[in-house]
């Protein structure tokens, strides 16, 4: 029997072979055959059995596995075998090598066979090889019968087609089974990808594949179902897939719009899709969506991969959340809300689905697509960054009504403990920034003593002023005062309080002014003629810090001499102790001078020269002040543990020097010099002697000196008030400053003598010895110019 006659029974329409393949033989449409499609006409150029036997060496054998795709009971199997034996005895044996080869999905025209379905990820069954002598199919029938005995009938019967690449049973191997043609045709029309026509390959009594209608297969994925069924009803969608020469275009590339969303393949065990309205699309087992791959006009292919963003190098593109065709700004009911992604500006966004049913799925990923640069892209990007019109909100600020709850259970991203608000919006949300303390930069609690300060600096300033503490900085009077280090150096903190303008009398003055205003208001109500008159205080205290206030802060503390009074006194031991004490006092004087406002602006050489010329002035005047304050000018208080009384003054070489020093304390006692006056006079003594050739910064020096002369006048006015005795007192104080030159000259002459006379064996500290060594030549040459207030 000819192969054409076996494949094309009488009374059936034939389909031209040009629809299936061109040029190189034909391939049987396995998909249509299983669905009852059109008959296939095999051309005469098909390879013969001999050709198939010659290609046996290049092909591998295949094991046909129907155990997971079909099942029947033992009784039906026996009936099938009996019917097959009867048909073989009654009818002559046809040459079905070509038909069987084609029905198994093998292209016998080429040695390289192509098994359909491997590109889609389905399990490959292998390749079929036919030997030249295997024209009898009894072994095949026995293997199929044995496999059918071991299989069981699965539940939920549904019609499906075998996977491409698996061999299909022939007419001799299965009995004929009758079915309803109308229902069968209706089922074919309802399935996507089928022929859907009324043309059948065989008649009812000659149909080879009607047995498939009685077989029940699972419609699920082979890898996901328990039975691992390889039969799929919707594997081959396009009929051109069976022919490699059907068209020039790649059958796997489908047309799609640029802005169309690319949906991933959703299997039965994966999460559902989301519609534009936020509803869940439930995928049925019979309609399993295949992965779609779209082609565009650009030179790249956009693949749909869940949770993966494809980035291109050819142009500026950006990632946009997929909203199923809706605009990211125009449609407020978008499917994805963005919040929780950290950016470089400190803002945080998170990605959540706008569906209440998906809020419980923590691992749900949004679908993204790569959008090529379009004219609207820059506008959307600017809107996402917060620019644009006021009625448009950014992604981070979107709060849709359809989103009932976020994936983490918080109703808004602001309630998340791990989400911090942007720094730029903190000030606008909480109002103006808090006011800071002008001393330590802490948060200010109010205006205290005329300055906006915190409570800690307020208490510190009050205690420092009322306690009359003489703080001394251990550094260079430039310590950093902030919230953390404000307690390290009280001297620098007190100085900064004065620089900020804190004044203890500001609070009292404020109360006085308030009381005066209340009294004025009461008097104005009683007498109408005084209603237009206002009472103004005579002089308001200056709230800005004065130089005298700064001088109070930087005043050095009193040093101890470490003299042992239990040991009998001697002139040598007292003078040696005084020299050691003088060396430490010189060091403190250097620190004090550098802290004087304006002194460090001078040239460094000028600073050293002024200190070398004035060190004895500073020590003698400070000694007179301590003696005046502690002993009323009758004793010399060098240190709290070293006081020169009348008995010690009688020691050899002590009386003449003590007499000059007592003169200073006596004058201070007579004039009743105040502390502010003393500070200004001490600063002027630092600036009382200069070289004859002048200083390198002479103009600045004269300006600084004149400034402190005016400060001395202010201190006098503060002490005496507005009286005619101010100029007289100024004359007396400046006269005392001029007399200091004579006292210091006598003290220096004795100091130089003891320093040069090695027989006296009086020790000098290193720093003091260096100063004396540098100063002796200048005094001997007369290279010193005295700055006097009055002429002799």
Curated annotation (Swiss-Prot):
The modification N6-acetyllysine is found at residues 496, 508, 510-511. There is a cross-link at residues 294, 310, 718 (Glycyl lysine isopeptide (Lys-Gly) (interchain with G-Cter in SUMO)). One of its GO terms (molecular function) is DNA binding. GO terms for biological process: adrenal gland development; astrocyte differentiation; cellular response to dexamethasone stimulus; cellular response to transforming growth factor beta stimulus; chromatin organization; gene expression; glucocorticoid metabolic process; mammary gland duct morphogenesis. Residues 1-436 are annotated as: Modulating. Residues 434-509 bind DNA. Residues 75-94 have a biased composition (Low complexity). It is found in: Cytoplasm; Nucleus; Mitochondrion; Cytoplasm, Cytoskeleton, Spindle. Acetylation by CLOCK reduces its binding to glucocorticoid response elements and its transcriptional activity. GO terms for cellular component: centrosome; chromosome; cytoplasm; cytosol; membrane; mitochondrion; nuclear speck; nucleoplasm. A zinc finger (NR C4-type) spans 437-457, 473-497. This is Glucocorticoid receptor. It comes from Mus musculus.
